[in-house]
């Protein structure tokens, strides 16, 4: 391990990142709270401000991926479609297999200049996660309870609110509804056999209702669906802790642009279309495992400096008073004060570890572990 790699693996560096993220995140969340005063006066101004405040938080995690760990991303796509990326609203359908697939989705949004306004269809519990969940609330993320009778109304209403959103955005949706595990996959394939659907080797069955209502609600606002299939070279299974430790990965992302007018408007036909899409995604994934590459032309969208600039700004803003406070405590010589400081720092680091745990596969939700629930929510 070289000197840089040794430095990146040090717990002290991780504490610095944790402190900057927590301190800046809570400051930004507080500012977002006060922006609620703008909502009844000027809703679009509220949205533009929160779009930029959201960037200040989410870009810190993208900075860790792109600049700290040095993870690279190669996009395989049609060169004729590439110029449209970042210039239009799009629904992004991304496979949900890796612990950092959401971070790769953010990186894609950042490289095309849409990170601040990016949206996602997320489980309702995430709205209560400090900093990121609260940030999502203020940027009008669409939350679902995974109970269709409730979601058919609440999700549709939330999506309708995005029809006049003033910023360009990618709307990310994991149609599988849950992260891939062997157990969930086997249960899903039991449902596939019961429904007479082809077996998928690398994906669970997609949940079609959420996709259909998203397409229906955003039609004539969103220009296309971006079918994205993610994999990592050398058969690696990256983790957020690995990124924090500075481990470098190389992501390969196959992106197909599908005009929204090519997707059926009827819900049943739209569901059949999505099942066919996932059969194609499965074939692309199988080809990747066999050949180590995806179809189409490989391209590397350049990383932008703004994630690093943003982190340096917040680091200088919150670290300087912190070190002043630390020096004053050391000079005071009070054992009780120092012990209290260490306790607070320990609790903060455990809090960040808990937030990281939300992304870990072995600590993921039980959603998808019951075939009866899958049949109900498909």
From Swiss-Prot:
Membrane topology listed for this record: Multi-pass membrane protein
Record flagged with keyword Lipid biosynthesis: yes
Entry's EC annotation: 2.3.1.51
Pathway: Phospholipid metabolism; CDP-diacylglycerol biosynthesis; CDP-diacylglycerol from sn-glycerol 3-phosphate: step 2/3
Organism the protein comes from: Macaca fascicularis
Sections of the chain in a coiled coil: none
Catalytic activity: a 1-acyl-sn-glycero-3-phosphate + an acyl-CoA = a 1,2-diacyl-sn-glycero-3-phosphate + CoA; (4Z,7Z,10Z,13Z,16Z,19Z)-docosahexaenoyl-CoA + 1-hexadecanoyl-sn-glycero-3-phosphate = 1-hexadecanoyl-2-(4Z,7Z,10Z,13Z,16Z,19Z-docosahexaenoyl)-sn-glycero-3-phosphate + CoA; 1-octadecanoyl-sn-glycero-3-phosphate + (9Z,12Z)-octadecadienoyl-CoA = 1-octadecanoyl-2-(9Z,12Z-octadecadienoyl)-sn-glycero-3-phosphate + CoA; 1-octadecanoyl-sn-glycero-3-phosphate + (4Z,7Z,10Z,13Z,16Z,19Z)-docosahexaenoyl-CoA = 1-octadecanoyl-2-(4Z,7Z,10Z,13Z,16Z,19Z-docosahexaenoyl)-sn-glycero-3-phosphate + CoA
GO function term, MF aspect, one: 1-acylglycerol-3-phosphate O-acyltransferase activity
Domain note: The HXXXXD motif is essential for acyltransferase activity and may constitute the binding site for the phosphate moiety of the glycerol-3-phosphate.
Gene name per UniProt: AGPAT4
Protein name stated in the entry: 1-acyl-sn-glycerol-3-phosphate acyltransferase delta
Family: Belongs to the 1-acyl-sn-glycerol-3-phosphate acyltransferase family.
Known role: Converts 1-acyl-sn-glycerol-3-phosphate (lysophosphatidic acid or LPA) into 1,2-diacyl-sn-glycerol-3-phosphate (phosphatidic acid or PA) by incorporating an acyl moiety at the sn-2 position of the glycerol backbone. Exhibits high acyl-CoA specificity for polyunsaturated fatty acyl-CoA, especially docosahexaenoyl-CoA (22:6-CoA, DHA-CoA).
InterPro entries xrefs: Acyltransf_C, Plipid/glycerol_acylTrfase
This protein's GO CC annotations: endoplasmic reticulum; endoplasmic reticulum membrane; mitochondrial outer membrane
Subcellular localization: Endoplasmic reticulum membrane
Alphabetical list of Pfam families matching this protein: Acyltransf_C, Acyltransferase
Motif window: HXXXXD motif: 96-101
Alphabetical keyword list: Acyltransferase, Endoplasmic reticulum, Lipid biosynthesis, Lipid metabolism, Membrane, Phospholipid biosynthesis, Phospholipid metabolism, Transferase, Transmembrane, Transmembrane helix
Biological process annotations from GO: CDP-diacylglycerol biosynthetic process
């Amino acid at each position: 391990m070289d000197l840089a790699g040794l430095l990146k693996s040090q717990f002290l560096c991780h504490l610095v990142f944790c402190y900057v993220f927590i301190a800046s995140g809570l400051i930004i969340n507080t500012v977002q709270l006060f922006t609620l005063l703008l909502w009844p006066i000027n809703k679009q101004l509220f949205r533009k401000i929160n779009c930029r405040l959201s960037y200040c938080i989410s870009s810190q995690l993208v900075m860790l991926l792109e600049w700290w760990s040095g993870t690279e991303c190669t996009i395989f796509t049609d060169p004729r479609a590439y110029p449209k990326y970042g210039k239009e609203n799009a629904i992004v359908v991304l496979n949900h297999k890796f612990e950092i697939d959401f971070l790769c989705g953010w990186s894609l949004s950042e490289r095309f200049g849409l990170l601040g306004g990016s949206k996602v269809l997320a489980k309702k519990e995430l709205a209560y996660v400090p900093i990121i969940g609260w940030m999502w609330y203020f940027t009008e993320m669409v939350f679902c309870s995974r109970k269709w009778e409730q979601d058919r109304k609440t999700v549709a209403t939330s999506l309708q609110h995005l029809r006049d959103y003033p910023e360009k955005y990618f709307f990310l949706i994991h149609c599988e509804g849950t992260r891939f595990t062997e157990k969930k996959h086997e249960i899903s394939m039991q449902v596939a056999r019961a429904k007479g659907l082809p077996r998928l080797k690398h994906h669970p069955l997609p949940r079609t209702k959420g996709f259909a209502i998203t397409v229906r609600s955003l039609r004539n606002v969103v220009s296309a669906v971006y079918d994205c299939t993610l994999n990592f070279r050398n058969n690696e299974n990256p983790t957020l802790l690995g990124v924090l430790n500075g481990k470098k990965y190389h992501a390969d992302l196959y992106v197909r642009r599908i005009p929204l007018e090519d997707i059926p408007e009827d819900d049943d036909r739209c569901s059949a279309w999505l099942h066919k899409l996932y059969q194609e995604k499965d074939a692309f994934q199988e080809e990747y495992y066999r050949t180590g590459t995806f179809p189409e032309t490989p391209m590397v969208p350049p990383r932008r400096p703004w994630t690093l600039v943003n982190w340096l700004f917040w680091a200088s803003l919150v670290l300087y008073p912190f070190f002043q406070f630390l020096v004053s405590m050391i000079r005071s010589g009070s054992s009780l004060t120092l012990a209290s400081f260490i306790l607070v720092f320990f609790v903060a680091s455990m809090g960040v570890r808990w937030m990281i745990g939300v992304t870990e596969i072995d600590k993921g939700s039980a959603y998808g572990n019951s075939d009866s629930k899958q049949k109900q929510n498909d």
